[in-house]
Design a protein with these regions (language model features):
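A composition/biophysics-driven feature that prefers long, compositionally simple stretches
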Residues: 1-177
Length: 178
């Protein structure tokens, strides 16, 4: 089943999930999660896209080449998404993209940036943070972006146990979809 339009789940549910993640994060930390990318089958034909389950669980967003950044400081919590910008030519062939301008409202996040700006924006957003929740080797394209951003953290934690535990318990909306 394609996760694309299981968005029979209200956006508030994804927001609540992110709030539960924030509650488990330590202050002055960030959680970074990358989406899947499109996988080429041959020449100009891709395999059907399937979103990363963890990324979809926190965003409900079904486009490739995106990243979710959750930032928790002593003062505030912020959800930021990096995604592909709109491209009318490519959208003619591959379907509409959400785009940076509409992402904050549609995904209920605080800020949105082009994924092309990750290397410059990620260091600015995380410069005063001391810890990162991240799973290395899950998405090599994302690990490369992270390495190129040249941000160093005092501690790195694995987010997978936290999110896996959360995903065990299904909401009434999820049960209805099963």
């Amino acid at each position: 089943m394609d996760l694309a339009y299981m968005a029979a789940l209200p956006q508030e549910e994804f927001t609540e999930r992110r709030q539960k993640v924030f509650a488990q994060m330590q202050p002055n930390s960030a959680l970074l999660l990358f989406s899947e990318i499109e996988k080429r089958r041959n020449n100009d034909c891709d395999f059907p896209f399937r979103q990363d389950s963890y990324f979809w669980y926190l965003t409900g967003f079904n486009e490739p080449n995106a990243a979710l950044l959750l930032i928790k400081t002593e003062e505030a919590e912020k959800a930021v998404v990096f995604l592909r910008p709109r491209d009318p030519l490519l959208e003619t062939w591959n379907g509409r993209r959400l785009g940076v301008e509409r992402a904050p409202q549609k995904l209920n996040v605080d800020e949105a940036y082009s994924i092309d700006d990750f290397k410059t924006e990620f260091p600015k957003l995380t410069e005063k943070l001391t810890a990162l929740y991240h799973v290395a080797d899950r998405h090599p394209w994302g690990d490369k972006l992270l390495a190129e951003s040249a941000v160093k953290f005092y501690a790195v934690f694995d987010w997978q146990p936290m999110l896996s535990e959360m995903r065990l318990i299904k909401s009434p909306n999820e049960i209805r979809l099963m």
